[in-house]
């Protein structure tokens, strides 16, 4: 683990939140000292790199969702520390200074965020976060039409009730509310769960755009390996409360021993490549993300 200057008491307005987010030897236990005690994280460390898309994978109960909640202080580690842009949150910290600023910069989107909508209009729901953090109310409201456009909803939806929308539309509104806070990092827990294929594609396109055009760091927990292959710069593999592997999607998905251990099937393209390998055509050492990449590499081999 890299050495970090601890600045626990530094004013958060002085922190550069674009720097790496480091979880250093962190642990977390649910229902401590009860018959239901469960150690979700067990003295593990990792880094979420600047301007990267990082996907976190692993079976249910491996610690993925617990780990991402440490990034913005929603929960506090029992050991080690969480470091955000040189700002250290030591284990068992009771109160984080200026926690609103921290949560502005690191926006956490839970699975099924549409259940967090509560305002009477879409405009008020999207503007709620920025206004709550001190932004001028009119300025926050003025941004809403552009945010609706970004998440592919009509701009004239501003005065509609969010409860009139479909599930997928509600999720777009909820995501727009997080983006409205204009933080450096989006932390997403199963963001496309329950969406139809068109909705999934729209969301993945949006995350790619937020990373490439808006320079947002994206941290995404998902069980959808096709999405991981499509979007990830780096993949973190969790198992029984620990990080057991970190690598590019190409490195992770070409390691069948690892995938078998964590009981995860590779993306569909890699399933096809494993079948081809059994037929004597090995493409697993190629950096293949899309069906177009696959066709190009296969054509080279078959020439």
From Swiss-Prot:
It is a peripheral membrane protein. PANTHER family: ENERGY-COUPLING FACTOR TRANSPORTER ATP-BINDING PROTEIN ECFA2 (PTHR43553:SF27), HEAVY METAL TRANSPORTER (PTHR43553). This is Energy-coupling factor transporter ATP-binding protein EcfA2. ATP-binding (A) component of a common energy-coupling factor (ECF) ABC-transporter complex. Unlike classic ABC transporters this ECF transporter provides the energy necessary to transport a number of different substrates. Belongs to the ABC transporter superfamily. Energy-coupling factor EcfA family. Pfam families: ABC_tran. GO terms for molecular function: ATP binding; ATP hydrolysis activity; ATPase-coupled transmembrane transporter activity. ATP binds at residues 58-65. It comes from Mycoplasma mycoides subsp. mycoides SC (strain CCUG 32753 / NCTC 10114 / PG1). The lineage of its organism: Bacteria, Bacillati, Mycoplasmatota, Mollicutes, Mycoplasmataceae. The keyword Cell membrane applies. Keywords: ATP-binding, Cell membrane, Membrane, Nucleotide-binding, Translocase, Transport. It is found in: Cell membrane. SUPFAM superfamilies: P-loop containing nucleoside triphosphate hydrolases (SSF52540).
């Amino acid at each position: 683990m890299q050495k970090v200057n601890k600045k626990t008491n530094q004013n958060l307005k002085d922190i550069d939140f674009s720097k790496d987010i480091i979880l250093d030897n962190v642990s977390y236990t649910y229902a401590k000292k009860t018959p239901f005690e469960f150690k979700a994280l067990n003295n593990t460390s990792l880094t979420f790199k600047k301007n990267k898309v990082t996907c976190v994978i692993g079976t249910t109960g491996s610690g993925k969702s617990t780990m991402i909640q440490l990034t913005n202080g929603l929960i506090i580690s029992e050991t080690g520390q969480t470091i955000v842009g040189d700002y250290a949150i030591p284990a068992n910290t009771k109160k984080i200074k200026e926690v609103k600023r921290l949560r502005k910069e690191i926006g956490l989107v839970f699975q099924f965020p549409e259940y967090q909508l509560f305002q009477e209009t879409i405009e008020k729901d999207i503007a709620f976060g920025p206004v709550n953090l001190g932004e001028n109310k009119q300025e926050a409201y003025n941004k809403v039409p552009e945010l609706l456009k970004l998440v592919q909803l009509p701009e004239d939806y501003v005065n509609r009730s969010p409860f009139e929308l479909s599930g997928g539309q509600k999720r777009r509104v909820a995501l727009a509310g997080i983006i409205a806070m204009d933080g450096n990092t989006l932390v997403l827990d199963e963001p496309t769960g329950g969406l139809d294929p068109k909705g999934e594609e729209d969301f993945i396109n949006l995350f790619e755009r937020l990373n490439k055009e808006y320079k947002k760091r994206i941290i995404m927990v998902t069980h959808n390996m096709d999405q991981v292959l499509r979007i990830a710069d780096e993949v973190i593999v969790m198992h029984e409360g620990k990080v057991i592997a970190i690598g590019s999607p190409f490195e992770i998905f070409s390691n069948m021993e690892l995938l078998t251990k964590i009981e995860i099937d590779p993306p569909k393209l890699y399933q096809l490549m494993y079948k081809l390998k059994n037929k004597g055509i090995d493409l697993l050492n190629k950096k293949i993300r899309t069906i177009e990449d696959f066709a190009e590499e296969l054509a080279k081999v078959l020439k």
